[in-house]
């Protein structure tokens, strides 16, 4: 648009004044992260350059930078809670370590998704 890609500071001020006269205003935002959620994927921009332009009450956002794309199916897998099946061996170990009944040990293991150490700590308190 301009020779050498640079603009005279005086021209820049004139251009900004003209934009304001036409009801246009622009501002650079200090964004750290921008996330755009689409139907099939999520786009994440780290350290983007974000500019907002207000034209007669309508705001337009311009985002530039590199994005990382993540599919939504991967996100759904992470959100799904996995139920761990507690073995009889684990129940006996926790019951013996904490000197509690097998029923108490089984309940504690189910509460912490089969984590032996966490179940022992839970019953120890």
From Swiss-Prot:
GO molecular function annotations of the record: RNA binding
Cysteines paired by S-S bonds: none
Alphabetically ordered keywords of this record: Protein transport, RNA-binding, Transport
Keyword Protein transport: yes
GO biological process per UniProt: protein transport
Record-annotated NAC-A/B domain positions: 9-76
One Pfam family here: NAC
UniProt xrefs under InterPro entries: NAC-like_UBA, NAC_A/B_dom_sf, NAC_arc, Nas_poly-pep-assoc_cplx_dom, UBA-like_sf
Quaternary structure annotation from Swiss-Prot or TrEMBL: Homodimer. Interacts with the ribosome. Binds ribosomal RNA.
Family of this protein: Belongs to the NAC-alpha family.
Function summary: Contacts the emerging nascent chain on the ribosome.
Protein name (Swiss-Prot/TrEMBL): Nascent polypeptide-associated complex protein
């Amino acid at each position: 648009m301009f020779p050498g890609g640079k603009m005279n500071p005086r021209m820049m001020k004139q251009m900004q004044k003209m934009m304001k006269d036409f009801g246009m205003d622009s501002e650079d935002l200090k964004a750290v992260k921008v996330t755009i959620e689409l139907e099939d994927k999520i786009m994440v921009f780290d350290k983007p350059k974000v500019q907002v332009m207000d034209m007669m009450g309508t705001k337009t956002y311009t985002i530039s930078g590199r994005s990382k794309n993540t599919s939504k199916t991967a996100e759904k897998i992470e959100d799904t809670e996995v139920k761990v099946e507690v073995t009889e061996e684990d129940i006996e170990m926790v019951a013996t370590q904490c000197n509690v009944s097998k029923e108490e040990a089984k309940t504690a293991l189910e509460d912490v998704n089969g984590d032996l150490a966490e179940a022992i700590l839970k019953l120890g308190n």
